Amino acid sequence: PPVTFSSFVISLGSSSLMLMGEQLDPNQASIPVNLPQAKEIIDLLSVLEDKTKGNLTSDEQTVLRDMLYALRMKYVTLASPK
């Protein structure tokens, strides 16, 4: 399938989730947790949100907003001292 803005956001988000320890495909080996790299992807998506403001369809906006929310919540949970 062709790459769309939404699929691009989902791909980046999935990478960030995997870097935070999520195993998206049970048939694949998990990768080591790397919170700084996961945060870098979150920051990249945040810049993308700022730079595309007013130029996205409502569906694209929703995908980006929801992905950023999920990633930020997961990151805060993992990065908080226990």
What are these regions (language model features)?
Residues 1-82:
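Long, contiguous alpha-helical segments
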